[in-house]
């Protein structure tokens, strides 16, 4: 057993599918309840939390090790509170659909989470999104798999962002990253010469937080953060993560959770859908169940 924690960041309006994600997490991955789960949130009441825990107990037959922790997001110093700033002139319309809370999430997972007080005692963390579903047993402990292979990061490749979204973020993100590379070349072991919009699927990832707590990564994140463009241009944590790993991590430090050979669904995308078990599919809420069957048919 590794020193690890599983993390969600959710909100009250997403609870109708988040609870199903939790059920499938304990059913198929955290089966013996050995790893704690922290659910960060900013608006879930104590009554609703109690109801969720009762529902989980009824489903699992035991009370899982789940802690709900309220988090207060604040804008970094110097960031405008004018809503108009978050729909920049010329910004692609799809980017304007992401509310301020989404951009707080990008900042949190991009760099703040690693030194959050509730995370400091852990080495590894697994992030699971509210609309992430494990649809078959994960037979091997993912954290042990990380340690055995010397991985410092792993994701589950699944689906892609819109090319227009990537292109919009890429315009300024790569320029900012190049500025950091130019002034920190002696600290960067593997500086990228170009970036074509590659990213990681951070909706389901495992991080060795010892790596991400290192000063060089934290300085890189601070450089990105101070531009304000996590908020103004929706620079995502998946993009921040890819460039930081590319700069500072050894080439063989990244694993792919597809190696663990299980079915994972995020939103409307499913990986290894033929491995899903019927008793897990039955737990899926609509419309996610319909999305799964479309993936199974290859639609």
Set out the residue ranges of the language-model regions.
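C-terminal catalytic/acceptor-binding lobe
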Residues: 200, 220-299
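Short, charged/polar "capping" segments at the starts of alpha-helices
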Residues: 15-16, 43-52, 163
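N-proximal low-complexity "stem/linker" segments adjacent to membrane-targeting elements
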Residues: 1-20
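Conserved catalytic core of nucleotide-sugar-dependent glycosyltransferases
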Residues: 86-106, 132-228, 234, 238, ...
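Short beta-strand-to-loop acidic/aromatic patch adjacent to the donor-nucleotide binding site
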Residues: 120-135
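Short internal beta-strands
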Residues: 36-43
